[in-house]
Amino acid sequence: MSDSRLVDPFGRRITYLRLSVTDRCDFRCTYCMSEDMQFLPRDQVLSLEELYAVADAFIGLGVRRIRITGGEPLVRKGITGLLARLGQRAELEDLAITTNGSQLRERAAELKAAGVRRLNVSLDSLQRERFAAFTRSDRLEQVLDGIQAAREAGFERIKLNCVVQKGRNDDEILDLVEYALANQLDISFIEEMPLGSITSHRRELTLCTSDEVRAIIERRWPLTPSLARSGGPSRYYQIGDEPSRIGFISPHSNNFCGDCNRVRVTAEGKLVLCLGHEGALDLRELLRSHPGDRERLSAALVAALNLKPERHHFDAQEQVQVLRFMSMTGG
Protein backbone atom coordinates (compact mmCIF):
# COMPACT_ATOMS: atom_id res chain seq x y z
CA MET A 1 0.00 0.00 0.00
CA SER A 2 1.31 3.42 -0.95
CA ASP A 3 1.94 5.90 1.87
CA SER A 4 0.81 8.80 -0.32
CA ARG A 5 -1.09 11.51 1.53
CA LEU A 6 -2.72 12.53 -1.75
CA VAL A 7 -6.06 10.72 -1.77
CA ASP A 8 -9.08 11.70 -3.85
CA PRO A 9 -12.77 11.32 -2.85
CA PHE A 10 -12.86 7.90 -4.54
CA GLY A 11 -10.00 6.44 -2.50
CA ARG A 12 -7.41 6.63 -5.28
CA ARG A 13 -3.92 7.44 -4.06
CA ILE A 14 -1.83 9.75 -6.23
CA THR A 15 1.72 8.48 -6.65
CA TYR A 16 2.49 9.74 -10.16
CA LEU A 17 3.14 13.33 -11.28
CA ARG A 18 3.39 14.47 -14.89
CA LEU A 19 5.26 17.77 -14.77
CA SER A 20 5.35 20.00 -17.86
CA VAL A 21 8.44 22.20 -17.99
CA THR A 22 7.54 24.20 -21.12
CA ASP A 23 4.72 24.73 -23.60
CA ARG A 24 7.25 25.35 -26.37
CA CYS A 25 8.11 22.73 -28.97
CA ASP A 26 10.25 22.51 -32.10
CA PHE A 27 7.50 20.44 -33.78
CA ARG A 28 3.87 21.39 -34.44
CA CYS A 29 2.13 18.01 -34.35
CA THR A 30 -1.34 18.32 -35.85
CA TYR A 31 -3.15 16.59 -32.97
CA CYS A 32 -1.21 18.48 -30.29
CA MET A 33 -1.34 22.14 -31.29
CA SER A 34 -2.51 24.50 -34.00
CA GLU A 35 -0.02 25.62 -36.64
CA ASP A 36 -0.18 29.25 -35.47
CA MET A 37 0.17 28.34 -31.79
CA GLN A 38 1.16 31.31 -29.62
CA PHE A 39 3.42 30.27 -26.77
CA LEU A 40 3.21 31.65 -23.26
CA PRO A 41 5.25 34.71 -22.30
CA ARG A 42 8.29 33.44 -20.43
CA ASP A 43 7.34 35.14 -17.17
CA GLN A 44 4.15 33.08 -17.08
CA VAL A 45 6.10 29.81 -17.18
CA LEU A 46 7.34 28.36 -13.90
CA SER A 47 11.04 28.87 -13.26
CA LEU A 48 13.26 25.84 -12.79
CA GLU A 49 13.34 26.54 -9.07
CA GLU A 50 9.54 26.72 -8.95
CA LEU A 51 9.29 23.47 -10.90
CA TYR A 52 11.59 21.80 -8.40
CA ALA A 53 9.55 23.20 -5.50
CA VAL A 54 6.41 21.63 -6.98
CA ALA A 55 8.14 18.29 -7.49
CA ASP A 56 9.64 18.43 -4.00
CA ALA A 57 6.23 19.00 -2.42
CA PHE A 58 4.70 16.11 -4.34
CA ILE A 59 7.57 13.81 -3.38
CA GLY A 60 7.10 14.78 0.25
CA LEU A 61 3.43 13.81 -0.02
CA GLY A 62 4.18 10.36 -1.40
CA VAL A 63 4.57 10.72 -5.17
CA ARG A 64 7.09 8.11 -6.33
CA ARG A 65 7.03 8.51 -10.11
CA ILE A 66 7.63 11.71 -12.04
CA ARG A 67 7.43 12.11 -15.79
CA ILE A 68 8.81 15.32 -17.31
CA THR A 69 6.79 16.55 -20.29
CA GLY A 70 6.20 19.61 -22.45
CA GLY A 71 5.79 20.90 -25.11
CA GLU A 72 9.18 19.45 -25.83
CA PRO A 73 10.99 19.32 -22.48
CA LEU A 74 14.46 19.24 -24.02
CA VAL A 75 14.08 22.73 -25.51
CA ARG A 76 13.80 24.13 -21.97
CA LYS A 77 17.07 25.83 -21.08
CA GLY A 78 18.63 24.33 -17.96
CA ILE A 79 16.45 21.22 -17.96
CA THR A 80 19.39 18.88 -17.32
CA GLY A 81 20.10 20.59 -14.01
CA LEU A 82 16.50 20.11 -12.88
CA LEU A 83 16.63 16.47 -13.93
CA ALA A 84 19.87 15.94 -12.01
CA ARG A 85 18.31 17.34 -8.83
CA LEU A 86 15.31 15.06 -9.20
CA GLY A 87 17.54 12.14 -10.12
CA GLN A 88 19.23 12.45 -6.73
CA ARG A 89 15.96 12.01 -4.83
CA ALA A 90 16.15 8.54 -3.32
CA GLU A 91 12.39 8.51 -2.71
CA LEU A 92 11.66 8.46 -6.44
CA GLU A 93 11.17 5.01 -7.94
CA ASP A 94 11.05 6.36 -11.48
CA LEU A 95 12.10 9.50 -13.35
CA ALA A 96 11.05 9.55 -16.99
CA ILE A 97 10.71 11.95 -19.92
CA THR A 98 8.31 12.18 -22.85
CA THR A 99 10.08 13.70 -25.88
CA ASN A 100 9.66 14.08 -29.62
CA GLY A 101 13.19 12.74 -30.00
CA SER A 102 14.58 15.70 -31.93
CA GLN A 103 17.27 16.42 -29.31
CA LEU A 104 18.16 12.87 -28.30
CA ARG A 105 21.04 12.35 -30.70
CA GLU A 106 23.08 14.95 -28.82
CA ARG A 107 21.56 14.64 -25.35
CA ALA A 108 20.67 11.02 -24.60
CA ALA A 109 23.87 10.36 -22.66
CA GLU A 110 23.51 13.45 -20.46
CA LEU A 111 19.90 12.55 -19.66
CA LYS A 112 20.96 9.09 -18.56
CA ALA A 113 23.76 10.57 -16.45
CA ALA A 114 21.27 12.96 -14.82
CA GLY A 115 19.22 10.03 -13.53
CA VAL A 116 16.46 9.65 -16.13
CA ARG A 117 15.48 5.98 -16.21
CA ARG A 118 12.92 5.74 -19.00
CA LEU A 119 12.09 7.57 -22.21
CA ASN A 120 8.87 7.86 -24.18
CA VAL A 121 9.44 9.01 -27.76
CA SER A 122 6.56 10.17 -29.97
CA LEU A 123 6.69 8.48 -33.38
CA ASP A 124 3.59 8.40 -35.57
CA SER A 125 5.15 7.42 -38.89
CA LEU A 126 8.26 5.84 -40.40
CA GLN A 127 7.61 7.51 -43.76
CA ARG A 128 9.43 10.79 -44.26
CA GLU A 129 6.68 12.76 -46.01
CA ARG A 130 3.98 11.50 -43.69
CA PHE A 131 6.11 12.21 -40.62
CA ALA A 132 6.60 15.76 -41.90
CA ALA A 133 2.84 16.14 -42.39
CA PHE A 134 2.13 14.96 -38.83
CA THR A 135 4.81 17.06 -37.14
CA ARG A 136 5.07 19.95 -39.62
CA SER A 137 8.82 19.25 -39.43
CA ASP A 138 11.00 17.21 -41.81
CA ARG A 139 13.21 15.55 -39.19
CA LEU A 140 12.38 11.85 -39.20
CA GLU A 141 16.01 10.74 -39.60
CA GLN A 142 17.05 12.98 -36.72
CA VAL A 143 14.44 11.34 -34.49
CA LEU A 144 15.43 7.81 -35.55
CA ASP A 145 19.09 8.65 -34.91
CA GLY A 146 18.07 9.95 -31.48
CA ILE A 147 16.29 6.71 -30.65
CA GLN A 148 19.45 4.77 -31.51
CA ALA A 149 21.52 7.13 -29.36
CA ALA A 150 19.11 6.52 -26.48
CA ARG A 151 19.47 2.75 -26.92
CA GLU A 152 23.25 3.10 -26.76
CA ALA A 153 22.97 5.26 -23.62
CA GLY A 154 21.40 2.33 -21.75
CA PHE A 155 18.01 3.53 -20.48
CA GLU A 156 15.98 0.96 -18.55
CA ARG A 157 13.20 1.12 -21.12
CA ILE A 158 12.44 3.18 -24.22
CA LYS A 159 8.84 3.34 -25.42
CA LEU A 160 7.40 4.70 -28.64
CA ASN A 161 4.08 6.55 -28.47
CA CYS A 162 1.99 6.41 -31.64
CA VAL A 163 -1.31 8.23 -32.10
CA VAL A 164 -3.18 6.16 -34.69
CA GLN A 165 -5.57 7.87 -37.10
CA LYS A 166 -7.68 6.20 -39.76
CA GLY A 167 -6.62 7.11 -43.27
CA ARG A 168 -3.49 8.86 -42.02
CA ASN A 169 -1.18 6.24 -40.50
CA ASP A 170 -3.23 3.14 -39.66
CA ASP A 171 -1.55 1.37 -42.60
CA GLU A 172 1.78 1.65 -40.72
CA ILE A 173 0.76 -0.18 -37.55
CA LEU A 174 2.60 -3.39 -38.48
CA ASP A 175 5.66 -1.47 -39.69
CA LEU A 176 5.85 0.36 -36.37
CA VAL A 177 5.55 -2.89 -34.41
CA GLU A 178 8.30 -4.43 -36.54
CA TYR A 179 10.53 -1.42 -35.88
CA ALA A 180 9.88 -1.71 -32.13
CA LEU A 181 10.63 -5.44 -32.12
CA ALA A 182 13.81 -5.04 -34.17
CA ASN A 183 15.13 -2.42 -31.76
CA GLN A 184 13.83 -3.96 -28.51
CA LEU A 185 11.56 -1.00 -27.83
CA ASP A 186 8.13 -0.89 -26.24
CA ILE A 187 5.35 0.78 -28.22
CA SER A 188 1.97 2.17 -27.16
CA PHE A 189 -0.81 2.90 -29.62
CA ILE A 190 -2.94 5.80 -28.44
CA GLU A 191 -6.48 6.83 -29.25
CA GLU A 192 -6.40 10.55 -30.03
CA MET A 193 -7.71 12.66 -27.17
CA PRO A 194 -10.14 15.52 -27.96
CA LEU A 195 -8.05 18.34 -26.50
CA GLY A 196 -7.93 21.73 -28.19
CA SER A 197 -9.72 22.86 -31.34
CA ILE A 198 -7.95 21.76 -34.54
CA THR A 199 -8.61 22.14 -38.27
CA SER A 200 -6.17 19.61 -39.76
CA HIS A 201 -8.61 16.67 -39.49
CA ARG A 202 -11.98 15.62 -38.07
CA ARG A 203 -11.35 13.53 -35.00
CA GLU A 204 -14.67 11.71 -35.16
CA LEU A 205 -13.68 10.39 -38.60
CA THR A 206 -10.05 9.54 -37.89
CA LEU A 207 -10.47 7.87 -34.48
CA CYS A 208 -8.97 4.39 -34.59
CA THR A 209 -9.86 2.39 -31.49
CA SER A 210 -7.45 0.18 -29.60
CA ASP A 211 -9.52 -2.88 -30.50
CA GLU A 212 -9.11 -2.06 -34.18
CA VAL A 213 -5.35 -1.62 -33.80
CA ARG A 214 -5.06 -4.83 -31.82
CA ALA A 215 -7.01 -6.76 -34.47
CA ILE A 216 -4.59 -5.56 -37.15
CA ILE A 217 -1.58 -6.67 -35.10
CA GLU A 218 -3.10 -10.05 -34.28
CA ARG A 219 -3.48 -10.88 -37.97
CA ARG A 220 0.29 -11.31 -37.93
CA TRP A 221 1.25 -11.97 -34.30
CA PRO A 222 -0.70 -13.43 -31.38
CA LEU A 223 -0.71 -11.06 -28.41
CA THR A 224 -0.42 -12.36 -24.86
CA PRO A 225 -1.44 -10.10 -21.94
CA SER A 226 1.58 -8.89 -19.99
CA LEU A 227 1.72 -8.60 -16.23
CA ALA A 228 3.96 -5.54 -16.58
CA ARG A 229 2.63 -2.17 -15.43
CA SER A 230 4.28 1.16 -16.11
CA GLY A 231 2.33 3.27 -13.63
CA GLY A 232 0.41 4.81 -16.53
CA PRO A 233 -2.79 3.89 -18.39
CA SER A 234 -1.29 1.47 -20.94
CA ARG A 235 -2.55 -2.12 -21.09
CA TYR A 236 0.41 -4.20 -22.24
CA TYR A 237 0.75 -7.32 -24.35
CA GLN A 238 3.72 -9.30 -25.59
CA ILE A 239 4.56 -11.25 -28.73
CA GLY A 240 6.02 -14.63 -27.82
CA ASP A 241 9.27 -14.22 -25.89
CA GLU A 242 10.09 -10.84 -27.43
CA PRO A 243 11.26 -8.32 -24.80
CA SER A 244 9.21 -5.55 -26.42
CA ARG A 245 5.79 -4.75 -24.97
CA ILE A 246 2.83 -3.63 -27.07
CA GLY A 247 0.60 -1.17 -25.21
CA PHE A 248 -2.81 0.37 -25.80
CA ILE A 249 -4.01 3.66 -24.31
CA SER A 250 -7.76 3.82 -24.80
CA PRO A 251 -9.41 6.94 -23.38
CA HIS A 252 -12.43 6.50 -25.66
CA SER A 253 -13.03 2.76 -25.92
CA ASN A 254 -11.78 1.49 -22.55
CA ASN A 255 -12.00 4.13 -19.85
CA PHE A 256 -9.02 3.77 -17.50
CA CYS A 257 -10.08 6.26 -14.83
CA GLY A 258 -10.84 3.68 -12.15
CA ASP A 259 -7.14 3.13 -11.54
CA CYS A 260 -6.06 6.75 -11.97
CA ASN A 261 -3.02 7.46 -9.81
CA ARG A 262 -1.78 10.66 -11.43
CA VAL A 263 -2.15 14.40 -11.72
CA ARG A 264 -0.52 16.93 -14.03
CA VAL A 265 1.08 20.31 -13.49
CA THR A 266 1.30 22.51 -16.57
CA ALA A 267 4.25 24.71 -17.47
CA GLU A 268 2.37 27.76 -16.19
CA GLY A 269 1.73 26.09 -12.86
CA LYS A 270 -1.83 24.84 -13.23
CA LEU A 271 -2.61 21.68 -11.29
CA VAL A 272 -4.75 19.57 -13.64
CA LEU A 273 -6.59 16.90 -11.71
CA CYS A 274 -8.13 15.24 -14.77
CA LEU A 275 -7.11 15.37 -18.42
CA GLY A 276 -10.74 15.47 -19.50
CA HIS A 277 -11.83 18.44 -17.38
CA GLU A 278 -11.07 22.14 -17.73
CA GLY A 279 -10.77 22.83 -14.01
CA ALA A 280 -7.31 23.52 -12.60
CA LEU A 281 -5.71 25.04 -9.49
CA ASP A 282 -3.24 27.92 -9.91
CA LEU A 283 -0.04 26.91 -8.13
CA ARG A 284 2.02 29.71 -9.68
CA GLU A 285 0.25 32.39 -7.67
CA LEU A 286 0.86 30.45 -4.48
CA LEU A 287 4.52 29.79 -5.35
CA ARG A 288 5.18 33.46 -6.06
CA SER A 289 3.17 34.85 -3.17
CA HIS A 290 4.79 32.49 -0.66
CA PRO A 291 8.16 31.43 -2.07
CA GLY A 292 9.83 28.63 -0.15
CA ASP A 293 6.70 27.81 1.87
CA ARG A 294 6.60 24.06 1.28
CA GLU A 295 4.06 23.47 4.05
CA ARG A 296 1.55 25.87 2.49
CA LEU A 297 2.07 24.34 -0.97
CA SER A 298 1.68 20.81 0.37
CA ALA A 299 -1.54 21.72 2.18
CA ALA A 300 -2.95 23.20 -1.03
CA LEU A 301 -2.14 20.02 -2.95
CA VAL A 302 -3.79 17.79 -0.35
CA ALA A 303 -6.90 19.98 -0.34
CA ALA A 304 -7.06 20.09 -4.14
CA LEU A 305 -7.38 16.32 -4.37
CA ASN A 306 -10.89 16.65 -2.93
CA LEU A 307 -11.89 18.16 -6.29
CA LYS A 308 -10.55 15.35 -8.49
CA PRO A 309 -13.47 13.99 -10.56
CA GLU A 310 -14.26 10.30 -10.80
CA ARG A 311 -13.65 10.10 -14.55
CA HIS A 312 -13.53 11.90 -17.86
CA HIS A 313 -16.30 11.65 -20.45
CA PHE A 314 -14.46 11.81 -23.77
CA ASP A 315 -16.79 11.39 -26.75
CA ALA A 316 -15.35 11.47 -30.27
CA GLN A 317 -18.75 12.38 -31.71
CA GLU A 318 -19.14 15.56 -29.66
CA GLN A 319 -17.55 18.98 -29.95
CA VAL A 320 -14.26 19.58 -28.17
CA GLN A 321 -14.89 19.39 -24.43
CA VAL A 322 -11.48 20.68 -23.30
CA LEU A 323 -10.12 23.75 -25.08
CA ARG A 324 -6.63 23.32 -23.61
CA PHE A 325 -4.20 21.86 -26.17
CA MET A 326 -2.13 18.80 -25.29
CA SER A 327 1.02 20.90 -25.68
CA MET A 328 -0.28 23.15 -22.89
CA THR A 329 -1.27 20.26 -20.64
CA GLY A 330 1.78 18.06 -20.92
CA GLY A 331 1.66 14.76 -22.77
From Swiss-Prot:
Sites where the protein binds S-adenosyl-L-methionine: Y31, G71, S122, M193
Protein name: GTP 3',8-cyclase 2
The organism's place on the tree of life at top rank: Bacteria
EC number(s) reported in the record: 4.1.99.22
Taxonomy of the source species: Bacteria, Pseudomonadati, Pseudomonadota, Gammaproteobacteria, Pseudomonadales
Start and end residues of each Radical SAM core domain: 9-234
PANTHER family (UniProt xref): MOLYBDENUM COFACTOR BIOSYNTHESIS PROTEIN 1, MOLYBDOPTERIN COFACTOR SYNTHESIS PROTEIN A
Family: Belongs to the radical SAM superfamily. MoaA family.
Binding positions for [4Fe-4S] cluster 2 per the UniProt entry: C257, C260, C274
HAMAP family: MoaA_B (MF_01225_B)
